[in-house]
């Protein structure tokens, strides 16, 4: 998903906002694809939330994509509802697509929260989830990408030209595990 979204939204020479600390693949794939990385800091004294004042002081004119990851890897920090609301407002103000990589939500939270619960988030945000963590299916490569129909069509155009899909048996097993909440 990280590759597909980056290919769909970022051209060489454009910028990607990446959390520090954060999942290294956001940086490595963006660099491979010719994007410039702009790190934004997550600090413990701020609950591992983005510092929106710091972000607003950056030159964001070439930023196309912003990665977030809540619950955060490697800190374990959880987003707050206010953080998600501010991310949506930030994305709309600066015409940036925010992607929340959310694979740990079902195992680290009693009440999982989604960025897409914020009104208007689907206009400017994408959210991933993965069954590799929540249902112990690593290597099956089964996950979810949720957004608006236009964004999804762009991502699917990239995906369909990279691979031919997941084996049907794996899809059926994943659907059953998800529907019955069988980890």
Question: Predicted segment positions?
Answer:
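Short, intrinsically disordered, charge-balanced linker/junction segments flanking boundaries
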Residues: 13, 58, 85, 177-183
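Aromatic/hydrophobic pocket-lining residues that form π-stacking "cages" and hydrophobic walls in ligand
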Residues: 4, 26, 87, 115
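Phosphate-binding glycine-rich loop
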Residues: 1-15
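A short helix->loop->beta-strand "cap" motif at the edges of active sites that frequently abuts
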Residues: 14, 35, 93-97, 121-123
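Active-site phosphate-binding strand-loop segment of PLP-dependent enzymes
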Residues: 38, 42-113
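Hydrophobic/aromatic ligand-binding patch that stacks against planar heteroaromatic rings
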Residues: 8, 28-30, 90
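Conserved core segment of the aminotransferase class I/II
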Residues: 120-183
């Amino acid at each position: 998903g990280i590759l597909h979204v980056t290919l769909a939204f970022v051209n060489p020479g454009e910028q990607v906002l990446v959390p520090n600390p954060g999942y290294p693949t956001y940086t490595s794939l963006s660099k491979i694809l010719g994007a410039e990385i702009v790190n934004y800091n997550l600090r413990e004294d701020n609950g591992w939330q983005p510092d929106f004042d710091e972000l607003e002081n950056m030159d964001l004119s070439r930023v196309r994509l912003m990665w977030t990851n809540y619950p955060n890897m490697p800190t374990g920090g959880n987003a707050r509802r206010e953080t998600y609301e501010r991310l949506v407002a930030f994305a709309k103000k600066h015409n940036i697509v925010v992607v929340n990589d959310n694979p740990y939500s079902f195992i680290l939270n009693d009440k999982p929260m989604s960025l897409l619960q914020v009104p208007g988030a689907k206009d400017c945000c994408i959210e991933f989830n993965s069954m590799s963590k929540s249902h112990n299916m690593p290597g099956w490569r089964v996950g979810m990408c949720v957004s608006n129909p236009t964004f999804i069509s762009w991502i699917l155009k990239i995906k369909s030209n990279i691979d031919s899909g997941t084996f049907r048996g794996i899809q059926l097993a994943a659907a059953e595990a998800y529907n019955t909440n069988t980890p």
